[in-house]
From Swiss-Prot:
Name of encoding gene: proC
Similarity annotation: Belongs to the pyrroline-5-carboxylate reductase family.
EC number: 1.5.1.2
UniProt xrefs under InterPro entries: 6-PGluconate_DH-like_C_sf, NAD(P)-bd_dom_sf, P5C_Rdtase_cat_N, P5CR-like_CS, P5CR_dimer, Pyrroline-COOH_reductase
Keyword Cytoplasm: yes
Protein's UniProt name: Pyrroline-5-carboxylate reductase
Length: 271
């Protein structure tokens, strides 16, 4: 991975995950600047020998890569002073949901290379899944850099059509919460079956981890086949799946993901 000076605007959880991933891979701490108004967050990064600042504009001027890690509703306010900076030879990366590259270009008119990223929280444990999009005028060099950057905390996929980022949000950006909800429901059900809370959690989390590993280690096997392999006719698994089917499980999942996609589309019009 090339070493470029990166200015992180915002030092929240996702920025922390990316920076820790970079440092773990040997990226030089002196090639990172973190800008955040929160003193505790700056102290956290200072303990990692990473430079910190409250001067977004000054850091953006110095850096070749500027990564916007702020909430969507803060984007316009954060970008307003940055619009005075010449971004023509810089890479702008945004990990904010619902902010299009067109909107970023309007906020910072001089920018020529933009990569929009939809990461997810498993990046905090190095198992993230990030969707990336870049307009055609973003250089191949900067595309590769952005991919390597997010690759420090998980896997990446590119989409060719920016509208697909809404589906990426539904598929990976928000989906950790779907899985947590499933685990939570299973744990609660086990507690009602007189299993203690700790044991219930261990049972469900290891089962999900094992199932996920079976999926990732057997990409040639269809998901439906993996499910069928666990399901004996007239058996216990079949009884459980029959209830899911009766409760329209697949349709509920699809409707939930569609609601997520629709909200992502709506957010593009708000910020």
């Amino acid at each position: 991975m090339q070493h470029k000076l990166i200015a992180f605007i915002g030092g929240g959880n996702m920025a922390q995950a990316i920076i820790l991933g970079l440092l773990k891979q040997g990226y030089p701490a002196e090639q990172i600047i973190v800008n955040d108004p929160n003193e505790e967050k700056r102290a956290f990064f200072a303990n990692l020998d990473v430079a910190t600042s409250e001067n977004n504009v000054g850091s953006a001027i110095k850096a070749e890569v500027v990564l916007l890690a702020v909430k969507p509703q803060m984007m316009a306010e954060v970008c307003s002073p940055l619009s005075a900076v010449d971004f023509s030879d810089k890479l702008l990366i945004s990990i904010a949901a619902g902010i299009s590259t067109e909107r970023l270009n309007a906020l910072i008119p001089s920018v020529k290379s933009i990569v929009r990223v939809m990461p997810n929280t498993p990046a905090l444990v190095g198992e993230g899944m990030a969707g990336l999009f870049a307009p055609k005028n973003t250089s191949e060099n900067y595309r590769t850099f952005a991919q390597d950057l997010l690759g420090a905390v998980g896997r990446t996929v590119w989409v060719n059509d920016e509208t697909q980022m809404h589906a990426v949000t539904a598929a990976s950006g928000s989906s950790p919460a779907y899985f947590f909800l499933m685990l939570e429901a299973m744990q609660k059900a086990l507690i009602k079956m007189n299993i203690d809370e700790k044991t219930a959690r261990e049972l469900v989390q290891q089962s999900m981890l094992g199932a996920a590993k079976m999926v990732t280690e057997n990409p040639q096997i269809a998901l439906s086949t993996l499910r069928e392999n666990v399901t004996s006719k007239g058996g216990t698994t079949a009884a459980a799946l029959a209830v899911f089917d009766a409760q329209h499980f697949n349709q509920t999942i699809e409707q939930a993901m569609q609601a997520c996609l629709s909200r992502s589309q709506e957010m593009e019009t708000l910020f």
